[in-house]
Each structure stands twice: as structure tokens, then as C-alpha cells.
């Protein structure tokens, strides 16, 4: 059946975590007969166990369903499910780039949240048509009128005629589909023009190699076509292509306006970069499509296997994981304390947790992560500039002219009664207030806060002081000159690189003392004294000693000459000295976790 362009609708779903996005997707699939009752399962599009368990969407997913309206016209709806969490905004931007419209789903019992606001701003920037949807109207505390006013006030979109629906019960789903057809424009494009296809996502399949999700902007792509990746110039033959309904359906061709998948025998995900353009090798397009900005890692942390014999499994696991996650960066490192491991770059703390959880669950690894760090910009007296993400490489000499740290703009939405504690928290985190706006039921706060403070445990503390009601969205803004110092931890005068941290100079002494005290609790006693020291610019600022274990060498000397006892004690003392010179401090690797999580205590 030949599809008419005017009968195609491409749209994404924008929503905060837990506002019912994945459930709404399930209802749309069910309503349009994408899956039978027997095949339906909760959160069809959330394929990872981790997605279902945490109740969040991590990867973008695409589905094409057919809907017959009251007049008998068949419409083809392509919708791309997007993640709602702040760490996965890169997935959202690339999903929106493939659409003409977006559903703005808001929980009618909770109202607008910060992440909804951020994703909606991205959609408006891309000039997409926004269809507001008030979900969960079946709940007793639902207040759609109030939430509709909130959407108008906070986001600036009229929502008085927004569809009221319940994804759980299916109420209002038919009206929603009619609104999608009415309000979201059909894609524009010309199938006679040279092929231009935007790569929305790529993932690795063990049997097929790299599978890419693409949106055809112009032209047609068919099986056996020779295609070219425009950024690299490399050519491949199309082996398979098709659509998801959400079952994988093979097809002979895809034409402009459609969203589908393609397999070209590519073995490495970097050969089909997300945001790139595919064109026909024989009749190439002149220009690449404007994709979306490539997101760089925001935080870095070291990951190490607890037992060294797992290193090779860990290396292979990271390689496989990075095939499905183009934003994950990693490089091998060697730590004197933790052995061989990898320095990994992540988009945020949740991204880091998800990656670590997947490595541990899917590959049965036992891992230790060092404290997350941000990138600092360092300018030397000779004008040279470098970017550093590893604390142990941080220079401590006098050649530094200035150190700059990344600042993020935090947008916080919260009920007015929690305003005081939240503002106190932002000030404690070295934040600068930019503005504050009172809405009918919520207050919108905008602060500039150092990223270093945000990535540690700002989100947890924010939820704590606001009883879980505040929502946060943050975005990198600029680098700001600041006085930072490096805290080194020494055990028996040996530096432990894994415990080196960068800290704001006013907090540095307290942080150093906390680490030293925690280490004293966690390191087991040895046959010799263990000296723990914290230094800032080579000056000791905190110190503690773990006293040696001593055997009572006088136990067998019931009486007798004092010189005999002195001789035994001297022999023990000499032995301890010798042991201290050659003895290694056995520090349990699990103790590192407690020390590195010190900021969460």
C-alpha cells in the first residue's frame, strides 16, 4: 500500500518521569492494534529490565501504527518514545529532530515539573506543534483545570482545550488520536529528490551488526541500495530495512516522511554516528541535514573491578555497552590503589548509575567507582590552557594563573512552603540567584550553581528538604574563575591516587578531615602503625594514626631478669620498624566505596 505523505504524522511524547508516558504509548499501540491483547505487556517500549524496574525510559524507541478515522481514512502514526530524566536530554533532542509535533503529557494530579519545561523549550526551539495532554484524570486528586492554567502560566502554551485522558483506563485515547491528526502537520519532503535520511539512534545487534533508526526527509531508500554516510564518506549496501509496529517488520523500501530501521552490515556504532545523514552513493544529496548537537560527557569517574581477574570481562563489557550508548566515553587507566580499570565519561549521575548497574547485572561484574568529577579549565602563566577531569593530574605548582569550574543553570519548580529550605540549600552549594517567579501553585527558581556541587548529591538533598516535591533541570552555562585546591591522601607517606579530590578552598579542610577520620574507621589494624595524612599544596592539614597490633612477647616471662624483657621488647620494636619499611597497607577495596561516598553521609 502506497502511503500518502498527508496521511503520515511523526510525533514524540514529552513528559516528566512518572507522568504516564510509557503507559500512554502502550494504550496508543493497543488502540491501533499494534499488538494483540495477549502480546501486550506493561511498558512495551521500555525494553530494558532496568527501565521497567526504575520506571524510567532510558533509550528512545520508535513505533509505527495505523489508525482508521470515522471517515475511513487510514493514517500512519510514527511516534518516538523519549526519556524524561534530566540525564537523558540528549535522547530527547534527537527524537524531537525527527518529528513535526510533540505530545506534552502532564500528570493532572501533580502539575508541571522542571524537566517537562526544559524538554518543551527544546521542542518549541525546533518549531514543533505542541499538543497538551492532561493524563491521570481517573485519580481522585486530579485537578485538570488548575494544571491547564499552570501550563499556560509556566510554559506559555494554551491548554484550556487540552485532551483529558487516563492512559491507565484508556479514557480519552480516541479523542487524543483525532487531535494528533488535526494539530500535528504532515511531513514535508520530496521523494524525487536525492536521499536524505537522519540517523536518530543506533544500537548493536549480535547477529545483524549496527541497526540504525532513521527518518527519511527526502527521497527513497530501498534494499540493495548503495548508501553513503555523509560525515565519513564511507559507503555500505542496505541489507535489511523495515519498521517497528512495535514488532520488527521487514520492508522493501522506506520513503520520505517515514521512520524506520536499517541494517547495512556496519560493525562499529561510530561508523553510523547519531545525528548524521545517509544519502544515496550514486545520486548523493548536496547538503547534510541539520541534526542536533553532540553532547559531551559532563562528569567523569573511574570504574575498577573488585577482583583483578575480572578486568578482561570488564573491558569487553564496556565495549559492548558503548555500542548501544554513543554518549559513553571510556579510556584505560592504572591506579596504584585499585589496579587496572577505566576512566569513564557520563552525562550525569543517573547515567553513571545506569551504566554501572547494567555492567554489574548483565555481565556479573563487581565494580568500584571513584567519586565523580567535573572538567576544570586551567590557565597557566604562559597563556596555555588545558582541560582536566582527573583530580590526581591536577597541578599544584605556582605556574597556574587561574582555575575555572563549570557553572550550570538550575531551574527548580517547587511548592511555596519549601522555598526557604531550598534557597538555603542553593546558597550552601555556592549558588547565585538569577530569578524567582511565583505561579498559582508553584514557585519557579533559577540559580547558577557550580556543577561540582550539583553532581555530588544536590538532587538527593533537594528532594530531602522539599519532601520530594521539588523538581530540577540543569544545563551547562559557562566556566567561572574560582579558587580550587587539590586534597591528597597519604598512607605511610605514599599518595593514594584514587582518593585525590578537588575541593573549593573554603570547604577543603573539613573535607580532608572527614576523609582521614573515615579511613581510620575503615582500614583494619596491621602489625605496624599506619599514618594517614591529608595534604593541600604539600602542607599537612589533617592527620591520624592507626595503632599497631602488638603481641605480648613478655607473656612467657613470668619473673626473671629485666634485661631479658628489654631484649625481647627491643627485638619486637626492630621487627616492627623493618615491617613498616617493607609492609604494604592492606586496604579493603570495599572501604573505598564508603570513603568516596563521604559527601553523602
Swiss-Prot record:
Catalysis performed (reactions): GTP + H2O = GDP + phosphate + H(+)
CDD domains assigned: EF4_II, EF4_III, LepA, lepA_C
SUPFAM superfamilies to which the protein is assigned, alphabetical: EF-G C-terminal domain-like, P-loop containing nucleoside triphosphate hydrolases
Membrane topology: Peripheral membrane protein
Species: Buchnera aphidicola subsp. Schizaphis graminum (strain Sg)
Keywords from the named record: Cell membrane, GTP-binding, Hydrolase, Membrane, Nucleotide-binding, Protein biosynthesis
Full protein name: Elongation factor 4
InterPro entries found in the cross-reference section: EF-4, EFG_III/V, EFG_V-like, EFTu-like_2, G_TR_CS, LepA_C_sf, LepA_CTD, LepA_IV
Residues at which GTP binds: 18-23, 135-138
Enzyme Commission number: 3.6.5.n1
One of the GO biological process terms: positive regulation of translation
Location(s), subcellular: Cell membrane
Enzyme class: hydrolase
GO CC terms of this entry: plasma membrane
Amino acid at each position: 500500500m502506497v502511503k500518502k505523505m498527508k496521511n503520515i504524522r511523526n510525533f514524540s511524547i514529552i513528559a516528566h518521569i512518572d507522568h504516564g508516558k510509557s503507559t500512554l504509548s502502550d494504550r496508543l499501540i493497543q488502540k491501533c492494534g499494534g499488538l494483540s491483547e495477549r502480546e501486550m505487556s506493561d511498558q512495551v517500549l521500555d525494553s530494558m529490565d532496568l527501565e521497567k524496574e526504575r520506571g524510567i525510559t532510558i533509550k528512545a524507541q520508535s513505533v509505527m501504527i495505523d489508525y482508521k478515522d470515522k471517515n475511513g481514512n487510514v493514517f500512519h502514526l510514527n511516534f518516538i518514545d523519549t526519556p524524561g530524566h534530566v540525564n537523558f536530554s540528549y535522547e530527547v533532542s534527537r527524537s524531537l529532530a525527527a518529528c513535526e509535533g510533540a505530545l506534552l503529557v502532564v500528570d493532572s494530579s501533580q502539575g508541571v515539573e522542571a524537566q517537562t519545561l526544559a524538554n518543551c523549550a527544546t521542542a518549541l526551539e525546533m518549531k514543533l506543534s505542541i499538543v497538551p495532554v492532561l493524563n491521570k484524570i481517573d485519580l481522585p486528586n486530579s485537578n485538570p483545570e488548575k494544571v491547564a492554567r499552570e501550563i499556560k502560566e509556566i510554559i506559555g502554551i494554551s491548554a484550556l482545550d487540552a485532551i483529558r485522558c487516563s492512559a491507565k483506563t484508556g479514557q480519552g485515547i480516541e479523542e487524543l488520536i483525532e487531535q494528533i491528526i488535526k494539530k500535528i502537520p504532515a511531513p514535508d519532503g520530496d521523494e524525487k529528490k536525492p536521499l536524505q535520511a537522519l540517523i536518530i539512534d543506533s544500537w548493536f545487534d549480535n547477529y545483524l551488526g549496527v541497526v540504525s533508526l532513521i527518518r527519511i526527509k527526502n527521497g527513497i531508500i530501498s534494499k540493495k541500495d548503495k548508501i553513503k554516510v555523509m560525515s565519513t564518506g564511507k559507503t555500505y549496501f542496505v541489507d535489511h530495512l523495515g519498521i517497528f509496529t512495535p514488532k520488527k517488520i521487514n520492508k522493501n523500501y522506506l520513503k520520505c516522511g517515514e521512520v524506520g530501521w536499517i541494517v547495512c552490515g556496519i560493525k562499529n556504532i561510530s561508523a553510523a554516528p547519531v545525528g548524521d545523514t545517509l544519502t544515496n552513493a550514486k545520486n548523493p544529496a548536496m547538503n547534510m541535514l541539520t541534526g542536533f548537537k553532540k553532547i559531551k560527557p559532563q562528569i567523569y569517574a573511574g570504574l575498577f573491578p573488585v577482583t583483578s581477574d575480572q578486568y578482561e570481562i570488564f573491558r569487553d563489557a564496556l565495549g559492548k555497552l558503548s555500542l548501544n550508548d554513543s554518549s559513553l566515553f571510556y579510556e584505560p587507566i592504572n591506579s596504584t590503589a585499585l589496579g587496572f580499570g577505566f576512566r569513564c565519561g557520563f552525562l550525569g549521575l543517573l547515567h553513571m548509575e545506569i551504566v554501572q548497574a547494567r555492567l554489574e547485572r548483565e555481565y556479573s561484574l563487581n565494580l568500584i567507582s571513584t567519586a565523580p568529577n567535573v572538567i576544570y579549565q586551567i590557565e597557566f602563566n604562559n597563556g596555555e590552557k588545558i582541560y582536566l577531569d582527573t583530580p590526581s593530574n591536577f597541578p599544584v605548582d605556582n605556574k597556574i594563573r587561574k582555575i575555572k569550574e563549570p557553572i550550570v543553570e538550575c531551574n527548580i519548580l517547587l511548592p511555596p512552603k519549601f522555598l526557604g529550605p531550598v534557597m538555603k540549600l542553593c546558597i550552601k552549594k555556592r549558588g547565585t540567584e538569577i530569578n524567582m517567579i511565583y505561579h498559582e501553585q508553584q514557585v519557579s527558581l533559577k540559580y547558577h550553581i557550580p556543577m561540582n556541587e550539583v553532581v555530588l548529591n544536590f538532587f538527593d538533598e533537594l528532594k530531602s528538604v522539599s519532601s520530594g516535591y521539588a523538581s530540577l533541570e540543569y544545563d551547562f552555562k559557562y566556566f567561572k574563575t574560582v579558587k580550587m585546591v587539590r586534597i591528597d591522601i597519604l598512607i605511610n607517606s605514599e599518595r593514594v591516587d584514587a582518593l585525590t579530590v578537588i575541593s573549593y578552598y573554603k570547604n577543603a579542610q573539613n573535607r580532608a578531615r572527614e576523609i582521614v577520620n573515615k579511613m581510620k574507621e575503615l582500614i583494619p589494624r596491621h602489625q605496624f602503625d599506619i599514618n594517614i595524612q591529608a595534604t593541600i599544596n604539600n602542607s599537612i592539614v589533617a592527620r591520624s594514626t592507626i595503632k599497631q597490633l602488638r603481641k605480648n612477647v613478655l607473656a612467657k616471662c613470668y619473673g626473671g631478669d629485666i634485661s631479658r624483657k628489654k631484649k625481647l621488647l627491643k627485638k619486637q620494636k626492630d621487627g616492627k620498624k623493618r615491617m613498616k619499611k617493607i609492609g604494604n597497607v592492606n586496604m579493603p577495596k570495599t572501604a573505598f566505596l564508603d570513603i568516596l561516598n563521604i559527601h553523602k553521609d
